[in-house]
């Protein structure tokens, strides 16, 4: 019973406690809500006041900005209005000026029309007067208008030709002076730095004997030794009354050299019979081939030309045994290479190319007696075969003037070839060829109309021409000299240059009686 009572009391106590707690909490919550509402109201009031202040400031700023923009717009408007007023005034001024100019042009146009009419009237008057004068001139002179025009044109043409001849002479004189001066300087420098000797042309070789008894041993029994020797070498062995000497004769200098060496070895050995002759000729042939190769290599080394084909080097070596008008062709080629290289250096051209072309320019002469064609054509084919540079081919093809040189190096090779050939002592020609050249020079000059006589003097290096003064005047003599020189260049082969001098002499003779 007490337990139940205690439980009831406890439950009642808890209920009273809960009710009391609820009441207390409600009071506290209501007090807190009242305080929060007061605080919120205070914040709202402050925010409202701040917003009102910001609003007033924004309105003031907006009004100021609007006022500022309004003032700016009004200022721009005033400026534009003023600018438009200025433009309007300028436009009015230009319109007034244009009106005045139009009026002036109209007045000038009227004046021009009057002048044109006056000129037309004057032209018609002059035309009528001219026709009358022409008719009168035709009546007086007996010439028609066309005849008078032709006569006038002929006179003008003669005057122009005279002036042209004088101008050409003046230009040629100046050009020759400048060209000769520069060429003389270049050639002098090149020649001073290049020295070369020359060899005399010959078709025989003399071999000395220790005694005349050796002649019989060379001939052999019934001449078998001499027949064997000649058949193996292709050279004639001449044994005559010349004491202690025999003569080897042949146009091929390489064969002649092989024969000389073989014969000297046979003489030194003393054993001369067909088998020994064959052995010595074979040995001499190998020696000469070795000499040819060494001569070609030495020539290329001397002029500092590299990269030559071995066959080209052999062909160069063969030139050691060839001559032209007494001049050794290999030495001539080396000399041309040196001269072309020196002149190329002076002119700023390709020195290596000039030397290479100069060294190979006569390469065709190594086999021209074995292959058909000129040495120029053969040289071009050989150089092309062994893959030489196209400009080297061009220089070889043009060095005798068969083609027009198109490169500086080709011109230099042509000039160096002429210089080397014309050098005193470098070449000699047969009397027959010399006389034919002189006759050819005089014959060319005598072919021209107005030539009275011609003389080739100074060993064919100058041609003097006497003309008929009644047919050739002073200006025509200038043209005649140039035409004769051009024809000589086309038809005559000669070393160096030939001076063509035209002499016109007028004599007046009378007798006192």
Swiss-Prot record:
Subcellular location: Cell membrane
Segments forming domain HD: 329-422
Keyword Secreted: no
Family: Belongs to the RNase Y family.
Alphabetically ordered keywords of this record: Cell membrane, Endonuclease, Hydrolase, Membrane, Nuclease, RNA-binding, Transmembrane, Transmembrane helix
CDD domains in the record: HDc (cd00077), KH-I_RNaseY (cd22431)
Domain KH: 203-266
Entry protein name: Ribonuclease Y
UniProt GO cellular component terms: plasma membrane
GO biological process: mRNA catabolic process
Entry keyword Membrane: yes
Function, as annotated: Endoribonuclease that initiates mRNA decay.
Species of the source: Carboxydothermus hydrogenoformans (strain ATCC BAA-161 / DSM 6008 / Z-2901)
Broad enzyme group: hydrolase
Pfam families noted in UniProt: HD, KH_1, RNase_Y_N
EC id: 3.1.-.-
Highest taxon listed in the record's lineage: Bacteria
């Amino acid at each position: 019973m007490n337990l139940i009572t205690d439980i009831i009391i406890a439950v009642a106590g808890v209920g009273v406690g809960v009710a009391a707690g609820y009441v207390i909490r409600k009071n506290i919550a209501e007090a807190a809500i009242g305080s929060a509402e007061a605080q919120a109201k205070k914040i709202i009031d402050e925010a409202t006041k701040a917003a009102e202040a910001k609003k007033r400031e924004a309105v003031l700023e907006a009004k100021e900005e609007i006022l500022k923009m309004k003032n700016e717009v009004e200022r721009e408007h005033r400026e534009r209005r003023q600018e438009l007023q200025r433009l309007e005034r300028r436009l009015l001024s230009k319109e007034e000026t244009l009106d005045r100019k139009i009026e002036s042009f109209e007045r000038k146009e009227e004046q021009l029309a009057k002048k044109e009419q006056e000129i037309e009237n004057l032209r018609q008057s002059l035309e009528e007067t001219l026709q009358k004068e022409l008719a009168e001139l035709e009546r007086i002179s007996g010439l028609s208008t066309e005849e008078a025009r032709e006569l006038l044109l002929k006179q003008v043409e003669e005057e122009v030709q005279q002036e042209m001849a004088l101008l050409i002479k003046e230009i040629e004189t100046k050009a020759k002076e400048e060209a000769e001066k520069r060429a003389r300087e270049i050639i002098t420098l090149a020649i001073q730095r290049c020295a070369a000797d020359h060899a005399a042309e010959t078709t025989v070789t003399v071999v000395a004997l220790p005694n005349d008894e050796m002649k019989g041993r060379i001939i052999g029994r019934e001449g078998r030794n001499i027949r064997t020797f000649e058949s193996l070498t292709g050279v004639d062995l001449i044994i005559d009354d010349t004491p202690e000497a025999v003569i080897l004769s042949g146009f091929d200098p390489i064969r002649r050299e092989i024969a000389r060496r073989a014969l000297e070895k046979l003489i030194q050995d003393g054993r001369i019979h067909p088998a020994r002759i064959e052995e010595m000729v074979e040995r001499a042939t190998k020696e000469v081939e070795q000499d040819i190769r060494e001569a070609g290599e030495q020539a290329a080394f001397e002029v500092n030309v590299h990269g030559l084909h071995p066959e080209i080097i052999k062909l160069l070596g063969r030139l050691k045994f060839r001559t032209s008008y007494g001049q050794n062709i290999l030495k001539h080629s080396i000399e041309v290479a040196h001269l072309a290289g020196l002149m190329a250096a002076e002119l700023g051209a390709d020195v290596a190319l000039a030397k290479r072309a100069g060294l190979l320019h006569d390469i065709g002469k190594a086999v021209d007696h074995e292959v058909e064609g000129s040495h120029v054509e053969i040289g071009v084919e050989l150089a092309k075969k062994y893959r030489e540079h196209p400009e080297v081919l061009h220089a070889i093809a043009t060095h005798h003037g068969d083609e027009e040189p198109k490169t500086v190096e080709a011109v230099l090779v042509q000039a160096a070839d002429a210089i080397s050939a014309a050098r005193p002592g470098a070449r000699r020609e047969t009397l027959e060829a010399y006389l034919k050249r002189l006759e050819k020079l005089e014959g060319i000059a005598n072919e021209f109309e107005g030539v009275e006589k011609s003389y080739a003097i100074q060993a064919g290096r100058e041609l003097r021409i006497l003309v008929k003064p009644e047919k050739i005047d002073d200006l025509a003599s200038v043209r005649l000299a140039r035409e004769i020189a051009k024809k000589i260049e086309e038809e005559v082969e000669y070393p160096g240059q030939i001076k063509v001098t035209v002499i016109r002499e007028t004599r007046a003779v009378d007798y006192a009686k």
